[in-house]
A protein has these predicted regions:
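Conserved aromatic anchor
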Residues: 200-211, 246-263
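Surface-exposed loop/turn elements that mediate protein-protein interactions on large endomembrane-trafficking
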Residues: 94-103, 140-154, 444-470, 502-509, ...
Length: 752
């Protein structure tokens, strides 16, 4: 028979341990270590991971602790796109923020979460702020908010332009020494940051007020970055209106300094002692001023002096005459501009409390609420005007926020020891699961609820009303372990079960459980990753992907669950490398481990042997890098060619004709290498379980077009033949050609 040729120029089918070595495709392989197969026509030795930076503190917990995020502002407050890396220091219960981790990395900030060590820190980043919590439930650790705040602040005479680290608590005003008064505002240090003073008068002269004649109570709130409103604190004072009365000369006074996350606040009103809804009375914005309701376009700006501020509009009159110890002030005709209740400032006007116009006695004279302290003829006085509020607003606390102010609690930063074990942001809401949180509406009881998912109102990523929850599989013997989202689908993983929930509708009453999948759960958040193709996850029994178009697909279908490398998956973490569309699965994050690489383009697996030398963190990626923490070193995955110890075992070739014997003559390998080393070649004959030695020699240095010819005549006749190659070096194999003759005899037991 003439010579025949079997050419193998593509190994992109990757690893296949599911089927018999004879039955797999020619482009598939039976065993591989440290060879990349994702480029058709090339098979090359892989590169090891490389160091990006090192940790200053102790390494993160297994499968937890690192997070990549980007900001438009650098740590030094310079406006420029920057990337940052959050690293957990579990010994000191801190998070180190590393700027420019892939350029010139530098530890620039530390976030302090408390005093309980050994935390499992998880993160989410949205609206320019990083949120951190201890999924391990450290009793003395508290959820944190870290973000850049840039805001003008006429209320305090200066702007905020800085990164802020704050407890992630949406605390209500303390309210100490803040009140509803009609004696003028005189802010003191005791008012600092605890709330808002409201100064007002009741108009009894006009008859066009729209308020019900009754006694009213008031409450105040803080508004935080992201327009997230706190619960309410009531004022001790009340105000009574008679028929047709209304409020006039309404001012807001405040004293710095507030938590930098607070951007303003609101004041509400309702009938005293009633269950009526709290109606908006004043909307306060530190940057723009105060308005009386959302429909009002005009803000009354703040004036600030020595850290105190009040809202107003104002005008001056340079014709005023004052007399020491006398409350009467004369002036030229002002055409009725000066009105009772106006706040008056100027030389000779008392300031504690601030004087107001108590009555206008004529076109050229008015009475102060207190005697002047100096005689001036003339003197310029400034008259400050507040709001006139003739009727109630249509806006209420519930209509603004979507929940009642009587909800009780709304944030994980409210108390140390509150936590969640997993988090994702989906359709403008934050979802957290397996929570230690307030049990129910209005309750202060904290309970661990492993079957509960909590979620925020739209756009309010730190606000968690206790009544906005999903309970699935209560007391089913499983806990929620991971959440991930894709589009408007929420994937909620328990230990063994996956729930897919449709959260498309803005109305949470229209959400529904789309499907339930048993046997597809995971053990931790780091076992799940979002990619451009969908959500991927790894568990001991397989590696899977879900997308809206294809549903659930087992990526590891060609890998036998009862054989290595699948049996080596014991504590997996998963990452994604966008540049080459690779999944990186490290099989055991708790010890030295091999890794699997899945290529989405070729739909193939390869294995990287001895990839990690110790326990690692979770895996993170940006568009260019995929990183993890190995000890105190941050390492990055590389898909490039490199020098390493590699193994390749081909399929068991029957040359397309298993029923006849073949006599192999030679093997021709086309390759390239920058430095030739010894490559050991072995063969398996007719499905033997143990290899026989074939050749061990140097494959010479060849930048291009290297050829290695290996004599096969000594093998004798075969029904099938498989090859194994091992080496430590930097090689690229382009193709293999087996030269053989068909003998024409049928194989028999013991035949050579």
């Amino acid at each position: 028979m003439p010579k025949q040729y079997l050419q193998l120029s593509n190994f992109a089918g990757g690893l296949n341990t599911k089927f018999d070595a004879r039955d797999i495709k020619d482009d598939e392989i039976t065993n591989v270590s440290n060879l990349q197969v994702y480029k058709p026509g090339q098979l090359f030795s892989s590169a090891p991971h490389t160091q990006v930076t090192t940790l200053a503190g102790t390494e993160p917990r297994l499968g937890y602790g690192i997070f990549l995020f980007k900001s438009d502002t650098q740590i030094d407050n310079t406006s420029a796109l920057t990337e940052m890396l959050a690293l957990a220091d579990t010994t000191n219960s801190q998070i180190d923020i590393i700027s420019d981790p892939f350029g010139t990395p530098a530890a620039t900030y530390e976030i302090d979460l408390g005093t309980t060590t050994g935390g499992k820190y998880i993160y989410y980043y949205v609206d320019g702020a990083l949120r951190t919590a201890d999924a391990n439930g450290g009793a003395n650790n508290t959820a944190n908010w870290y973000g850049f705040v840039k805001r003008g602040s006429s209320a305090f005479g200066g702007d905020i332009n800085d990164w802020e680290s704050k407890t992630n608590d949406l605390a209500a005003p303390g309210g100490e020494n803040c009140g509803i008064t009609d004696t003028g505002y005189a802010p003191t240090a005791s008012n600092s940051g605890v709330g808002f003073d409201v100064d007002l008068s009741v108009s009894i002269t006009d008859d066009d007020g729209l308020w019900e004649a009754t006694t009213y109570e008031f409450a105040q709130s803080f508004v935080y970055e992201g327009d997230q409103e706190s619960l309410l604190t009531t004022y001790p004072e009340t105000v009574t209106l008679s028929v047709n009365n209304y409020f006039e000369n309404v001012y807001v006074g405040l004293k710095s300094a507030f938590n930098e996350r607070i951007k303003g606040g609101r004041v509400y009103i309702r009938k005293q002692g009633s269950n009526d809804l709290w109606t908006l009375f004043l909307d306060i914005d530190f940057e723009r001023g105060v308005r009386k309701d959302f429909g009002a376009q005009d803000y009354h700006g703040f004036s600030a002096t020595s850290g105190a501020a009040y809202s107003h509009t104002s005008f001056t009159d340079a014709t005023c005459d004052t007399t020491n110890t006398d409350a009467t002030v004369g002036h030229d005709d002002d055409d009725g501009a000066i009105k009772a209740g106006m706040w008056v400032t100027g030389t000779g006007i008392p300031t504690v409390p601030d004087a107001t116009v108590s009555s206008v006695t004529s076109d050229t004279e008015f009475e102060l609420s207190a005697n002047a302290t100096a005689t001036n003829d003339p003197v310029t006085l400034t008259f400050h005007s507040g709001f006139t509020i003739k009727g109630p607003s249509i806006d209420t606390y519930e209509s603004i926020n979507g929940f009642s102010p009587d909800i009780g609690q709304i944030s994980f930063g409210q108390s140390a020891g509150l936590f969640y074990k997993t988090v994702t942001v989906c359709n403008m809401r934050t979802f957290v699961a397996h929570v230690n949180y307030y049990k129910s509406t209005g309750s202060s009881e904290i309970k661990l609820m492993p079957d509960r998912i909590l979620y925020t109102p739209p756009g309010k990523y730190d606000t968690f009303p206790p009544n906005q929850f999903i309970d699935i599989g209560i007391n089913d013997g499983e806990d929620f372990t991971a959440l991930e989202s894709f589009g408007t689908k929420l994937l909620a993983f328990k230990n063994s079960t996956l729930y897919i929930i449709d959260v498309t509708s803005p109305d949470d009453m229209e959400w529904f459980l789309e499907s339930t999948h048993n046997g597809l759960g995971v053990d931790k958040p780091a076992a799940v990753i979002r990619t451009e193709f969908g959500i991927c996850w790894a568990r001991k029994t397989g590696i899977y992907a879900w997308s809206p178009s294809q549903g659930i697909v087992e990526l590891s279908a060609k890998l036998d669950k009862n054989l290595s490398p699948m049996t080596d998956i014991t504590d997996p973490v998963i990452g994604y490398y966008p540049q080459d569309s690779h999944l990186l699965i490290i099989q055991n994050c708790g010890a030295a481990s091999d890794a699997l690489i899945y290529d989405f383009t070729t739909k193939s697996f390869t294995e990287l042997g001895s990839y990690t030398s110790d326990a690692i963190s979770n895996i993170q990626n940006d568009v260019d890098n995929t990183i993890f923490s190995l000890g105190t070193s941050i390492r990055t995955y590389s898909s490039a060619q490199g020098s390493t110890a590699w193994i390749l075992e081909t399929k068991d070739f029957d040359f397309g004709n298993p029923g006849v014997l073949k006599r192999p003559l030679k093997l021709i390998v086309s390759y390239s290498t920058s430095s030739g080393v010894t490559v050991t070649s072995n063969y398996y004959k007719d499905g033997d379980g143990a290899p026989d030695g074939l050749n061990s020699s140097t494959w010479a240095t060849a930048s291009n077009g290297g050829v290695k010819v290996i004599d096969l005549k000594g093998i004798g006749s075969v029904a099938s033949l498989k090859f194994k190659f091992t080496a430590t070096g930097n090689y690229q194999i382009n193709d293999m050609t087996i030269v053989y003759r068909t003998i024409g005899k049928s194989p028999s037991t013991g035949q050579n």
